[in-house]
């Protein structure tokens, strides 16, 4: 029953006026304002305030207080303080409420009659974060009669509420506030976008109060069930659910054991909406057809005013309407429907203006919009729909009208709910049971499971309604037609049968008078619309669609039941709409049916149910068929036959019981009196009407009063003896249960949801905009991942569709299509011409580029002082201060280009002269790049100083480089060629001219630097600054090659606004844009604004007035690279945060850009990357590159408050109150700036407002904020600290966060140290900031226009030295700007710190980054670890001399061609993987030494697919446990064999040893990895990660094996990522076993664990006998073969070592229950376990001794490798055990066995020279020499220890490789300091064979 809002809230609405003519008095106004401030203290905007006033909530628009969501706060507070106190009586408890809110609530109640108890129970983890001091554990039960829960009901399920009542016998009422949008029931868009916005996902929705997604929170999508729930039935009692108060999305629920309101429906507020006619959009979602009435009226007026509107005109008109802010909630799908409606409406016969005949409507609308609908709508239906819609436009406001449901719980199934939108959790078996229930009337198993009926009726005794049986027979016929060859004849007979039946029913007039008749009955139509639609769409789509014309004709000729006819018309329209491809769709359906076992099972389901149902015999099955056949007849025939059949069955029944109860219909009962959900149409139960007692006073039962208000309802709850006004149980079999199990769409989408990895639909372009719009609509409704493939000819203009997130059950469905350019004509006046031509075919070479025009001479800027270019000086080491390239040339920026043979083999002609000091400047070093290329921006040619020598010519490229440059890897994409200088001001584009006019024409010209763009493109390709798809990676290769091929050179005009934080740089730029937008509305089509972050993009889009399309005009910096379609003007905000080289790449890809406008601050943070060898770290940063182009410098800020500005030493014009405070406690309501990124992300996930030092740049906090300073702050750069200090316009609070009494550690940063000393010495902070500003500002002060009048230091005492202008306009000199390399933070380096003490966690900074890790770490002992020495990066350069012979050079073809001659081409070695539709990317394809080895990448989907298919095995936990129990005997055999190898006595468990192992494990876990690695793995410390859940990925590695050189792509290595708690818990026990096994090892057994190669060499020299043969072996799929047998072996080993029993059981449980996102896994070994190498080695020993007779000789083991110094024979009893193991061994017998890559030879161990040779060649190109050279050198020296004995067991080819290696490392040691030190400590032997060989 709908309660009028005026009456419901009359008591709470305050009236401030005495009468209609007089206003309130001053006293009344002040009283009312004070009353309003209690629940609405914050300022509310005009739009939300008007909505709140409609529901009796007054607000204050001029309040000085602000809030992030003031309107929702007022709604929440009004319910909390004004309404809730009415429902709290007697003893009550309050859960989940803040302390201050509880005190406010306590002040509103009567303390004499009500007692409140506060139990701050946290419902979710987010509440624990927001409300400190909450109790995370559930309190268990409520001890009071009434319980109040604040905003928690939406997170609770009916089972949770019922359990709470069951465990709280004293509780009789639950009063709860909840925020549940009522439109979420149908997934409609937000009805009130001024108050909140919604975002729907697969299983939850995101609720953004006041549209602020920064404060948004998630809630389960199933929470909307509380909106339509009337009662909650359980096995013990029944609960009533009422909603006495509701305002927009805020509701008050009362759940009690007392009876509730006698309502059958529940209404909620809704804006004035209308529903578009169904005739236009059959089968569409209702949410997409509900549009605001005013918007539809505008379209109706438009359609009536034009002669004939096309779809293009209607689309343009719709966009013009939707641009209004009040229609912001209208989705693109709704816009599409409105456009179709307008174009079709203009061609229909309107009531007052006929335009065209009615018959033209089908041709004009259906043929044009839906080309595949080849039939016409009947005229009767058109008139009916048009009249209904016109009437609908005159109806009052549309309301959300929900029918209330009764929620049933059953005790035997844990109250599972199958019909309330829980289809995701239902298994396929449950869904098949639902199909059975729909097809054949009832399934006993389904009835037993859902309704809890333990004695269901037999299958044959439940008669089917005619509609259900008829549809079941149609399904069976459809299945036969799909399977059997003669399906055409059967389909013809089926259509004829239904046609004859329909004709008989229609022709016979007696049938038309019956309320329910045959196929056209109301009950059939209702069932078809709800439950039958699933089967109609699913199993027999073609059959049902072919019978649709019959339904049409029947609907037209049956005017007595128009509602039923309309339903049938809708069903037919749905079928025609979805299956519009006819024969093709039939072929696809048939093919999938035959290939897919799941679909085949669904199609054969009728046969299975018919022949394998629950009937005990064939007799009963045939009886069921007879029953269904009878049910298909009309009612006047079927009912007597069913009665006769029941009588016959009664006579045959021996116990005279009626097995088939027939409920005959009552002639006096109507359709409304009968239950349509019941298969037998039983009568509804009558409501019990108790007799009125004469002693009863009418007001004693307030539920019967006419005016039902909140007060009346609250009073009714106090009555405990009120009888329930409705039945408490529903005894009908709900066939509608299956309606919630499957989606409402067609079956193939349902099957994709269930079995998504078996179907992929590729839909191509049909040339119309409708196709992709319809696909986008389906993707939005089903929440599919949409991937778009764009044709090459459309790439230039296409902007892309929004990609939906959230795969279905972890699977992706790809909808690929080529777009139609529907918006090309709406882009404005300026047309950029046709798109570039497509690339040439791959078989032909690309056309040669045209000769680029000569660059015009550069004209100096039109300013007084011309900027001079500073020459980079060389330091004492011969390195440039602005680069970290050492002595590499520009072409060597890419390490993929190898040095030529001349670089390493050529002898210098003379001894190299030492470099002289830089101060003498007698000679200038070789330039880094050729003179034709630019290192960074050069404003003008710089004259060479007279005392400097001329620059030598650049090194000529080698022949290899030329060949690589002339042979592109693939055809080049369309890239710009040629180039030109920037046009003059009079030749600029009109938009660029306008910007130049605003700066008085004083723009500057900037030359695009090619090396910077090359560096950025290579970083982008390697993933150093982000990840990109494979297709884009190939395009980047083409862009990199095009630099050399096309020789692109150009220059652009620039305007650079520079200044300190808060000086209005961005505001000045946006004001210019806003001014020009007002003058020229088409300017937005030619100007693009680029920001570094999404937050800044949204902020800039909101600042511009009128607001622009944020997704089109304002972009992030990735968009111009992915979609290069910029206009003439590019505005870059916060350019300092852009990667180095980004702008040059954008200008290269977007040749139309003529002007670039920057805003940047050199004193704030710059772009950072965690990749230390990234190219962007080696070139000047973005702000350093444009230092000489500053057009305007702004130094006076208007952001910080005077108190904050004085403390920071900054000039300001602000007058806001504020100062710098210090504290140690966080305020959760303040904006927080933290140093840890994962902590900030974690807080933001749960509703906090937290930034990092880097992400806060560009933001302005208009209220107080706090900055956290802890041990991790010292790893940040001064620029980021300065940016974080200057973000706010109010109070700044410094929070010093420590975990112990010890002070925070210091660093070399003066600004950080000044922040630490601020509490004691605040004067150091302004000095540190002044020094920081002086470090970067001076280079920006030359040739700038000062934004303020020049004043000297005396007149401006607040000015910094860097800002003081000397006479003549020159600024004071300062220190040169630091390079980016010297200013990088050290967070990526390995931080070695002392061991952690439990009471002193501050000494371990890693724990501050990983908050959850602290709870897993044990006690530590004090120890000191020296700081590791990081070798200086050294790159290989030019030639250097050697004394060795040169008969075997490094690039001798005899060494290289022998390996590479027989290799396949790179493009033929990668393989195509059909499952993912991609090719592996394991071969580099560069044509150099990198092609020798395969490279596994972590982002290679194809390699991951074949890896998982080969490495993983799947099984359920129960099967794993059974396997463990069945293999105990085989496990004991392994353990017995292991004891023969290593005797293990029974011992007592050593607890002290375990503690040592725990300390060692924890210390190694934190100190062995760099801090950056721990930060990247921070998610492994999340407590929400399940202990038995692993995350799988492939290991990124290079396969450097001799047998894999030049091979085809292979499977990689799968890595399992466990939760950190699992690793830290099991690590000590693994170390314990390792220590005990080492202590018991026999002297002749060697385990290569925690040993070095020198240890292995010593063991071989002491124990190996080279006079006899040895046996070595390897296994195939060794990890996957570690099954349950080895688990039993490992448990026996633990028992022998006296492990605690609970530890052993926990280990077995973990091995049996491991699961992943692919599903539960079988028992196997995973790379990533703490046991992997240990148990692999021990299992190898056990298996070897179980299979072979092994003598007591020298033997070595390591993982799956082994080598035994003797031939071994198979044991006699092995034949009985061979079937119990899955291991496949590959034994090899010989005199020179191999072990772990080493060859055991007389005299020692030797690394294979050929493998070491190619590894060196690969590493020389791929990595820095300092990283790989020392390790390979040690392996070479260890091999050479055998001296001249190598001549005996090495071939001449191996000796040639060895000689080349010795010669190379000898030369390299002269140039690499770290290798030279290693050579002095470990020199090459004097009798090296290289010396012997060099005598020739």
From Swiss-Prot:
Residues 945-959 have a biased composition (Low complexity). Residues 1195-1327 form the (+)RNA virus helicase C-terminal domain. Its EC number is 2.7.7.48, 3.6.4.13, 2.1.1.-. Residues 1668-1774 form the RdRp catalytic domain. The keyword Hydrolase applies. It comes from the Viruses. It catalyses: ATP + H2O = ADP + phosphate + H(+); RNA(n) + a ribonucleoside 5'-triphosphate = RNA(n+1) + diphosphate. One of its GO terms (biological process) is methylation. InterPro entries: (+)RNA_virus_helicase_core_dom, Alphavirus-like_MT_dom, DNA/RNA_pol_sf, P-loop_NTPase, RNA-dep_RNA_pol_alsuvir, RNA-dir_pol_PSvirus. Residues 828-866, 891-987, 1347-1385 are annotated as: Disordered. Residues 60-227 form the Alphavirus-like MT domain. RNA replication protein replicates the viral genomic RNA. The central part of this protein possibly functions as an ATP-binding helicase and/or methyltransferase. This is RNA replication protein. The lineage of its organism: Viruses, Riboviria, Orthornavirae, Kitrinoviricota, Alsuviricetes.
């Amino acid at each position: 029953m709908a309660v009028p809002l005026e009456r419901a809230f009359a008591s709470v609405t305050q009236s401030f006026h005495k009468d209609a003519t007089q206003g309130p008095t001053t006293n009344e106004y002040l009283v009312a304002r004070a009353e309003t401030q209690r629940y609405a203290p914050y300022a509310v905007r005009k739009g939300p305030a008007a909505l709140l006033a409609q529901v009796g909530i007054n607000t204050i628009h001029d309040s000085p207080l602000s809030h992030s969501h003031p309107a929702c706060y007022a709604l929440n507070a009004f319910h909390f303080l004004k309404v809730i106190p009415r429902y709290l009586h007697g003893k009550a408890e309050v859960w989940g409420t803040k302390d201050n809110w509880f005190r406010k609530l306590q002040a509103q109640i009567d303390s004499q009659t009500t007692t409140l108890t506060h139990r701050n129970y946290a419902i979710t983890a987010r509440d624990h974060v927001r409300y400190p001091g909450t109790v995370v554990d559930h309190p268990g039960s409520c001890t009071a009669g009434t319980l109040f829960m604040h905003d928690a009901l939406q997170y609770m399920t009916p089972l949770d509420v019922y359990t709470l009542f069951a465990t709280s016998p004293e509780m009789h009422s639950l009063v709860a506030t909840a925020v549940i949008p009522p439109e979420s029931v149908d997934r409609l868009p937000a009805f009130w976008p001024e108050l909140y916005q919604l975002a729907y996902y697969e299983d939850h929705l995101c609720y953004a109060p006041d549209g602020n997604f920064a404060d948004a929170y998630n809630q389960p999508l199933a929470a909307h069930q509380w909106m339509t729930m009337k009662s909650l039935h359980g096995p013990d009692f029944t609960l009533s659910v009422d909603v006495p108060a509701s305002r927009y999305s805020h509701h008050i629920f009362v759940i009690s054991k007392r009876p509730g309101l006698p309502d059958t429906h529940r209404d909620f507020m809704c804006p004035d909406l209308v529903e578009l006619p169904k005739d236009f959009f059959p089968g569409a979602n209702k949410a997409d057809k509900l549009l605001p009435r005013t918007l539809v009226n505008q379209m109706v007026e438009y359609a009536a005013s034009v002669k004939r509107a096309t779809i293009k005109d209607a689309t343009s008109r719709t966009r013009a309407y939707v641009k209004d802010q009040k229609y912001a909630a209208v989705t693109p799908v709704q816009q599409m429907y409105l456009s179709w409606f307008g174009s079709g409406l203009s061609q229909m016969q309107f009531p007052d203006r006929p335009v065209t005949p009615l018959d033209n409507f089908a041709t004009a609308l259906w043929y044009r919009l839906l080309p595949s609908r080849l039939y016409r709508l009947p005229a009767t239906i058109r008139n009916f729909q048009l009249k209904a819609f016109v009437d609908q436009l005159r109806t009052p406001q549309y309301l959300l009208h929900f029918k209330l449901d009764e929620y049933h719980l059953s005790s035997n199934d844990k109250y599972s709910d199958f019909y309330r939108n829980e289809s995701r959790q239902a298994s396929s078996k449950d869904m098949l049971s639902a199909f059975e229930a729909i097809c054949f009337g009832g399934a006993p198993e389904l009835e037993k499971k859902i309704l809890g009926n333990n004695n269901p009726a037999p299958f044959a005794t439940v008669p089917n309604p005619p509609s259900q049986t008829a549809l079941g027979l149609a399904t069976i016929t459809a299945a036969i037609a799909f399977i059997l060859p003669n399906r055409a004849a059967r389909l013809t007979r089926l259509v004829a049968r239904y046609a004859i039946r329909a004709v008989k029913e229609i022709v016979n007039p007696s049938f038309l008078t019956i309320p329910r008749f045959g196929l056209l009955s109301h009950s059939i139509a209702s069932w078809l619309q709800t439950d039958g639609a699933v089967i109609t769409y699913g199993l027999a789509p073609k059959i049902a669609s072919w019978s649709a014309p019959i339904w049409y004709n029947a609907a037209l000729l049956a005017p007595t039941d128009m509602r039923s006819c309309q339903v049938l018309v809708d069903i037919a329209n749905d079928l025609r709409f979805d299956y519009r491809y006819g024969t093709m769709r039939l072929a696809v359906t048939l093919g999938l049916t035959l290939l897919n076992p799941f679909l085949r099972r669904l199609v054969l389901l009728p046969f299975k149910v018919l022949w394998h149902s629950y009937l005990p015999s064939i007799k009963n099955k045939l009886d069921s068929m007879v029953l269904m056949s009878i049910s298909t007849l009309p009612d006047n025939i079927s009912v007597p036959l069913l009665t006769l059949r029941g009588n016959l069955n009664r006579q045959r029944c021996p116990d005279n019981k009626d097995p088939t109860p027939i409920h005959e219909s009552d002639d006096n009962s109507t359709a409304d009196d009968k239950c349509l959900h019941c298969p037998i149409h039983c009568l509804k139960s009558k409501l019990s009407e108790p007799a009125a007692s004469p002693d009863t006073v009418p007001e004693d039962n307030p539920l019967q009063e006419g005016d039902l208000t909140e007060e009346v309802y609250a009073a009714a709850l106090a009555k405990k003896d009120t009888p329930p006004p409705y039945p408490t149980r529903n005894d009908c079999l709900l066939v509608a249960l299956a309606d919630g199990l499957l989606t409402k769409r067609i079956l193939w989408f349902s099957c994709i949801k269930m079995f998504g990895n078996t179907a992929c639909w590729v839909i191509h372009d049909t040339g119309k905009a409708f196709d992709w719009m319809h696909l986008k609509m389906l993707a939005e409704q089903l929440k599919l991942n949409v991937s778009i493939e764009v044709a090459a000819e459309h790439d230039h203009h296409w902007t892309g569709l929004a990609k939906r997130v959230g795969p279905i059950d972890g699977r992706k469905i790809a909808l690929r299509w080529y777009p139609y350019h529907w918006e090309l004509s709406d882009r404005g006046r300026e047309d950029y011409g046709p798109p570039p031509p497509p690339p040439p075919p791959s078989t032909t070479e690309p056309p040669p580029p045209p000769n680029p025009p000569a660059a015009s001479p550069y004209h100096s800027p039109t300013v007084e002082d011309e900027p001079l270019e500073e020459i980079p000086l060389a330091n004492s080491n011969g390195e440039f201060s602005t680069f970290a390239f050492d002595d590499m040339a520009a072409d060597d920026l890419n390490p993929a280009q190898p040095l030529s043979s001349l670089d390493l083999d050529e002898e210098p002609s003379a001894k190299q002269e030492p470099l002289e000091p830089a101060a003498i400047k007698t000679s200038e070093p070789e330039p880094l790049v050729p003179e034709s290329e630019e290192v960074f921006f050069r404003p003008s040619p710089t004259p060479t100083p007279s005392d400097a020598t001329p620059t030598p010519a650049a090194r000529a490229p080698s022949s290899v480089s030329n060949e690589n440059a002339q042979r592109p890897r693939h055809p080049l994409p369309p890239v710009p060629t040629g180039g030109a200088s920037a046009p003059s001001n009079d030749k600029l584009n009109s938009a660029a001219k306008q910007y130049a006019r605003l700066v008085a024409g004083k723009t500057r010209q900037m030359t695009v630097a090619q090396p910077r763009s090359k560096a950025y493109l290579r970083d982008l390709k390697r993933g150093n600054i982000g990840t990109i798809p494979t297709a884009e990676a190939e395009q980047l290769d083409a862009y990199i090659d095009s630099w050399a091929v096309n020789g692109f050179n150009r220059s652009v005009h620039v305007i650079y606004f520079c200044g300190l934080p808060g000086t209005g740089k961005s505001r000045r730029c946006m004001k210019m844009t806003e001014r020009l937008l007002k003058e020229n509305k088409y300017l937005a089509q030619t100007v693009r604004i680029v920001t570094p972050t999404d937050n800044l993009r949204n902020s800039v889009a909101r600042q511009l007035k009128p607001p622009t399309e944020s997704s089109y005009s304002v972009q992030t910096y990735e968009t111009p690279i992915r979609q290069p379609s910029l206009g003439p003007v590019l505005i870059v905000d916060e350019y300092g945060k852009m990667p180095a080289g980004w702008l040059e790449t954008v200008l290269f890809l977007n040749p139309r850009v003529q002007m670039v406008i920057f805003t940047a601050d050199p004193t704030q943070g710059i772009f950072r990357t965690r990749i230390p060898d990234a190219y962007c770290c080696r070139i000047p940063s973005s702000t350093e590159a444009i230092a000489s182009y500053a057009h305007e410098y702004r130094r006076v800020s208007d952001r910080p408050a005077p108190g904050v500005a004085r403390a920071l030493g900054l000039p300001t014009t602000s007058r806001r109150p504020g100062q710098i405070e210090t504290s140690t406690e966080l305020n959760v309501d303040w904006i927080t700036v933290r140093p840890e990124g994962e902590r900030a992300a974690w807080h933001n996930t749960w509703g906090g407002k937290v930034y990092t030092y880097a992400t806060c740049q560009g933001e302005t906090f208009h209220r107080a904020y706090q900055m956290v300073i802890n041990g991790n702050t010292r790893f940040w750069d001064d620029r980021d600290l300065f940016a974080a200090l200057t973000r706010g316009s109010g109070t700044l609070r410094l929070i010093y966060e420590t975990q112990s009494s010890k002070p925070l550690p210091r660093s070399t940063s003066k600004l950080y140290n000044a922040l630490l000393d601020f509490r004691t010495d605040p004067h150091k902070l302004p000095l540190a900031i002044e020094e920081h500003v002086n470090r970067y500002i001076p280079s920006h002060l030359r040739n700038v226009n000062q934004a303020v009048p020049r004043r000297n230091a005396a007149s401006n005492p607040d000015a910094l030295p860097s800002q003081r202008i000397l006479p003549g306009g020159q600024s004071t000199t300062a220190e040169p700007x630091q390079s980016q390399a010297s200013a990088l933070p050290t967070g990526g380096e390995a931080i070695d710190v002392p061991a952690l003490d439990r009471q002193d966690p501050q000494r371990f900074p890693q724990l501050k980054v990983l908050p959850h890790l602290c709870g897993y770490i044990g006690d530590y002992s004090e120890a000191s670890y020296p700081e590791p020495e990081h070798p200086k990066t050294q790159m290989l350069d030019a030639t250097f001399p050697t004394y060795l012979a040169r008969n075997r050079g490094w690039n001798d073809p005899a060494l290289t061609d022998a390996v590479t001659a027989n290799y396949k081409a790179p493009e033929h070695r990668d393989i195509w993987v059909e499952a993912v539709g991609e090719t592996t990317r394991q071969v580099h394809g560069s044509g150099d030494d990198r092609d020798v080895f395969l490279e596994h990448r972590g982002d290679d989907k194809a390699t991951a697919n074949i890896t998982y298919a080969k490495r993983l095995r799947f099984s359920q936990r129960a099967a794993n446990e059974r396997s463990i129990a069945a293999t105990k005997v085989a496990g004991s055999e392994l353990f017995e064999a292991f004891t023969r190898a290593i005797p293990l006595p029974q011992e007592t468990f050593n607890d002290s040893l375990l503690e040592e192992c725990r300390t060692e494990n924890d210390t190694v876990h934190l100190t062995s990895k760099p801090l950056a690695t721990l930060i990247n793995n921070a998610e492994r410390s999340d407590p929400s990660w399940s202990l038995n859940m692993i995350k799988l990925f492939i290991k990124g590695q290079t396969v450097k094996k001799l047998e894999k050189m030049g091979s085809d792509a292979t499977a990689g290595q799968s890595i399992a990522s466990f939760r950190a708690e699992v690793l830290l818990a099991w690590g000590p026990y693994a170390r314990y076993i390792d220590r005990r096994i080492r202590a018991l090892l026999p002297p002749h057994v060697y385990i290569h664990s925690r040993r070095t190669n020198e240890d292995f060499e010593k063991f071989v020299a002491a124990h190996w006998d080279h006079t006899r043969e040895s046996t070595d072996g390897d296994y195939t799929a060794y990890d996957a073969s570690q099954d349950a047998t080895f688990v039993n072996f490992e448990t026996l080993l633990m028992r022998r070592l006296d492990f605690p029993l609970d530890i052993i059981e926990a280990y077995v449980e973990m091995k049996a229950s491991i699961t992943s996102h692919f599903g539960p896994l079988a028992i196997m070994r995973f790379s990533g376990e703490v046991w992997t190498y240990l148990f692999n080695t021990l299992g190898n020993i056990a298996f070897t001794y179980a299979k072979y007779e092994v003598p007591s000789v020298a033997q070595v083991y390591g993982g799956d490798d082994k080598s035994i110094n003797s031939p071994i024979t198979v044991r006699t009893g092995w034949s009985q055990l061979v079937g119990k193991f899955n291991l496949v061994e590959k034994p090899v017998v010989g005199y020179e066995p191999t072990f772990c890559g080493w060859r055991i030879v007389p005299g020692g161990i030797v690394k294979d020279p050929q493998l070491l040779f190619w590894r060196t060649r690969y590493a020389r190109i791929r990595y820095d020499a300092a990283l790989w050279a020392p390790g390979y050198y040690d392996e070479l020296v260890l091999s050479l220890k055998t001296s001249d004995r190598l001549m005996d067991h090495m071939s001449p080819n191996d000796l040639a490789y060895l000689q080349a290696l010795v010669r190379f490392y000898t030369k390299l040691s002269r140039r690499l300091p770290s290798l030279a030190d290693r050579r002095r400590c470990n020199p090459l032997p004097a009798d090296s064979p290289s010396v012997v060989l060099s005598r020739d």
